Amino acid sequence: MSQGDDNPAIDPKTADAAETVTIGRHVVFSHGKESGPWGRKISSLVEVARSEGYEAHSVDYRGLDDPRQRVARLAQFCKELAGDLVLVGSSLGGYVAVASASLLHARGVFLMAPALYMPGLPELREGVLDCPATLVHGWRDDVVPFEHSIRFARTHRAALHLLESDHNLHNQIRVIQYLFEYFLIALDLPALAFE
């Protein structure tokens, strides 16, 4: 779904099998449980993605609380995309991005206060991620403990940035834009950029 489109990303019940595949470089955003597909963080990162030569898409998960249904919706949406795929997720959207990354052969994942290792969510198997990852989390997050991002970063050798912020990270959007830009640039560099 492109910015400004009010329809759900792709409804598997009504998806047209004859739709064309879009080839290129794609960033696909997954929003959190309490937000929408064009919330403040996502909207602020769209221009960064476009400036680095990516098409920006945001999947609408409103009304889907089950993370397995969200993963299925993301997989269905990404069937229409070919080429480089970068997944970006915030909160529950971060969980969805991680759970989908290997299946979708993502080139990288960028996670903001991801809901990892949370009670009530299906457990992710260790080592589930096979691409570069960067995590951004707020020290004062009272929804998802920042320690969960530390654990994930340690396990997956991912970059981690802990910022003076809370769960929504709104006071750090400019910093997150810079971190996201660096992440996208580094994906085009030799492997040393993530080691």
Residue ranges and their predicted role:
Residues 88-97:
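Gly/Ala-rich beta-loop-alpha elbow adjacent to hydrolase catalytic centers
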Residues 105-117:
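A conserved short beta-strand
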Residues 154-169:
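Catalytic histidine neighborhood in serine/cysteine hydrolases
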